Amino acid sequence: MVRDLLAFHGINYDEAVKTGKCHLQAEGLDQGPDGIGTGSSIPLSRAFDPEAKVLLAYEMNGEPIPRDHGYPLRFVVPGTVGARQIKWLTKLELSHEESHSATQRRDYKYFGSNVTDPKSIPWDDTPSVQEYFKIRKSIT
């Protein structure tokens, strides 16, 4: 689990939050349409939550994870949108803010019917739906 990896490297949740580092960013080898490496982030609280089961996958069905599924390492966040599952993981980083990738900042947002002017939408300041709608599923 990612929480075990963070603890192994001496990262303490309470100490990280005191310094304002409340997000765990993941970056992959491929690039998005904006030229920025594909990435995502989750709240650090989720990374440390034992029930969230955030993990780094290197196998799938008992075999090394196939290239098309993220070989050699994939960041997996159960219960959230697929765009948070970063393939070809190159980096995990504690941060003061969410990832700057397009899928984190511009996609998976929900705005009510009261928003009538798309130019007035505060994209970067609005959390993604993963923080509003908790999806439950199980990994065995």
Model-derived features: positions:
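Long, well-ordered hydrophobic secondary-structure segments characteristic of membrane-embedded
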Residues: 1-7
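Extended, aromatic/histidine-rich regions of cofactor-dependent oxidoreductases associated
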Residues: 7-140
